[in-house]
């Protein structure tokens, strides 16, 4: 079931890729993908290219994929291990969701962080109290690690 579904998603992704994202298997392993997300132009991540790994569980799509950033990113919902705090990757997952939708959700998280459900409280605090400093730091990290 899982590998058939993953094959179908790969076909759909190749046919109709989401804006500013690409993804596909690493080598022959259909359960391990790498994705590339372009930093949204209306965010401090503009111009950055962010690598993301995707691991599908054997019971996909009934369980969410494990998705993590490999590129360092300064963001209240992404920690230094690359873990992403995103409801659809946890309790709001639904088998109706696809990798394409997950990648789009991550893109919009880059544009609109959720400081009320942070993975990194210090960055969330900066986002809420000193937006200018947050954006400058995020821009600096993007230039340093994602370009």
Swiss-Prot record:
This is Ubiquitin-conjugating enzyme E2 5A. CDD domains: UBCc_UBE2D. It comes from the Eukaryota. Residues 1-15 have a biased composition (Basic and acidic residues). InterPro entries: UBQ-conjugat_E2_core, UBQ-conjugating_AS, UBQ-conjugating_enzyme/RWD. Its EC number is 2.3.2.23. Keywords: ATP-binding, Nucleotide-binding, Transferase, Ubl conjugation pathway.
């Amino acid at each position: 079931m899982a590998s058939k579904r993953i094959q179908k998603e790969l076909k759909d992704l190749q046919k109709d890729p989401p804006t500013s994202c690409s993804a596909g298997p690493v080598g022959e392993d259909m359960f391990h993908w790498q994705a590339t997300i372009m930093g949204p132009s209306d965010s401090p991540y503009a111009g950055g290219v962010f690598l993301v790994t995707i691991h599908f569980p054997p019971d996909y799509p009934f369980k969410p994929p494990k998705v993590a950033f490999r590129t360092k990113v300064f963001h209240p919902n992404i920690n230094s291990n690359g873990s992403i705090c995103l409801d659809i990757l946890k309790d709001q997952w639904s088998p109706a969701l696809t990798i394409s939708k997950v990648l789009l959700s991550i893109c919009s998280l880059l544009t609109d962080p959720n400081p009320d459900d942070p993975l990194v409280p210090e960055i969330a605090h900066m986002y809420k109290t000193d937006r200018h400093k947050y954006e400058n730091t995020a821009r600096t990290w993007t230039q340093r690690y994602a370009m």
